[in-house]
């Protein structure tokens, strides 16, 4: 019962993100403008790596972002040739962030309590998470990589403790 309730809530909140995508939700207020400003960098990287890096490095405003996001998205754009496909793919990828956060909390606190689940899905209510997922901005990808690294760090720490106990 508890498991089905969690899945239902997660699916419902995921659907709200898809509805936000369909209706061009801009809950943070600046994501649509950021997308229009940053999308040419993605296009430049999809033409060629050299052109992309040249334009990226020549613009001081772009240097606050990592070029990895632009490289990954431009690669997807190049192979699919569809911005809608890339946007939906990125939206689906962003749906992993609450799951990763849930895994972090579960590993750290060694429990599968409902409170941990509710804490992890609060991410869906963040206007910045929603806007970044909907408008193809790199913030969520950074958080996904960071969360994955935390999970591996926690597992490493657990393994280290187990090895100490065996000695």
Walk through the language-model features, giving the residues of each.
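Extracytosolic helix-loop segments that constitute the early lumenal/periplasmic catalytic or substrate-binding loops
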Residues: 18-20, 36-61, 68-71
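Loop-to-helix entry region of an early transmembrane alpha helix in multi-pass inner-membrane enzymes
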Residues: 57, 63, 67-74, 79-96, ...
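Short acidic/glycine- and proline-prone juxtamembrane loop motifs at membrane-interface regions
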Residues: 131-141
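Transmembrane-helix motifs of polytopic, lipid-linked glycan transferases
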Residues: 85-109, 148, 152
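Short helix- or helix-capping micro-motifs
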Residues: 116-127, 131, 151
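Transmembrane signal-anchor helices characteristic of membrane glycosylation enzymes that use polyprenol
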Residues: 4-39, 125
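Membrane-interface starts of transmembrane alpha-helices
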Residues: 8, 81-89, 111-119
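Membrane-interface transmembrane helices that cradle and orient dolichyl/undecaprenyl
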Residues: 107-113, 149-166
């Amino acid at each position: 019962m508890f498991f089905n309730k969690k899945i239902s809530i997660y699916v419902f909140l995921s659907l709200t993100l898809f509805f936000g995508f369909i209706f061009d939700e801009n809950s943070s207020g600046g994501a649509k403008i950021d997308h229009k400003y940053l999308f040419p960098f993605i296009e430049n990287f999809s033409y060629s790596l050299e052109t992309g890096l040249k334009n990226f490095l020549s613009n001081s405003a772009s240097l606050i972002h990592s070029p990895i996001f632009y490289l990954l998205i431009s690669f997807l754009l190049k192979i699919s040739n569809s911005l809608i496909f890339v946007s939906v793919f990125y939206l689906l990828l962003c749906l992993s962030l609450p799951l990763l956060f849930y895994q972090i909390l579960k590993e750290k606190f060694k429990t599968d309590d409902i409170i941990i689940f509710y804490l992890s899905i609060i991410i869906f209510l963040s206007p910045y998470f929603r806007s970044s997922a909907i408008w193809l901005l790199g913030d969520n990808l950074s958080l996904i990589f960071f969360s994955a690294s935390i999970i591996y760090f926690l597992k490493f720490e657990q393994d280290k403790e187990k090895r100490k106990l065996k000695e």
